[in-house]
């Protein structure tokens, strides 16, 4: 995760580095992505990069988690619009994702995740899931899901 030094940077400086990283990770597979290209495009010294993130994986993890958070916000809005009906919300979420193609690779945008998955075939098989904390997602969804619309036998059946 980013250091406090990074979080204290001016937003435009953060955006510059993150935009360069998004471009790098969406244009190349993770194992070919280069910190040198990222810092060159962002216009920062390589040493500064290491003051902000431990390594390439740390930056990649941050980008993926930020993108997932953005998608959760969208899903929460869809769920609320569907009165907490998960099964009615899923097709809407699918439509949302299809309407935001991989070309929409802005920071945290759904296209970013799509492009990263497409560039990293090995990650599709669950590698990205290691960056996700399911219990936090479930906690966040708790207020949005209407349990009365589900066939729950125990409160724990929802996962929290």
Predicted features and spans:
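Short amphipathic alpha-helical segment with a characteristic S/N-K-E followed by hydrophobic residues
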Residues: 55-60
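Amphipathic alpha-helical packing segments from all-alpha helical-bundle domains
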Residues: 69, 88, 117-160
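Short, basic, alpha-helical segments at the C-terminal edge of helix-turn-helix-like DNA-binding modules
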Residues: 65-72, 76
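DNA major-groove recognition helix of helix-turn-helix
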Residues: 53, 64
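Helix-turn-helix/winged-helix DNA-binding modules
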Residues: 27-30, 51
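Hydrophobic alpha-helical connector segments
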Residues: 62, 77-103
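Basic, helix-initiating cap at the start of DNA-binding domains
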Residues: 1-28, 36-37, 41
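Short hydrophobic/aromatic patch on the recognition helix
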Residues: 43-52
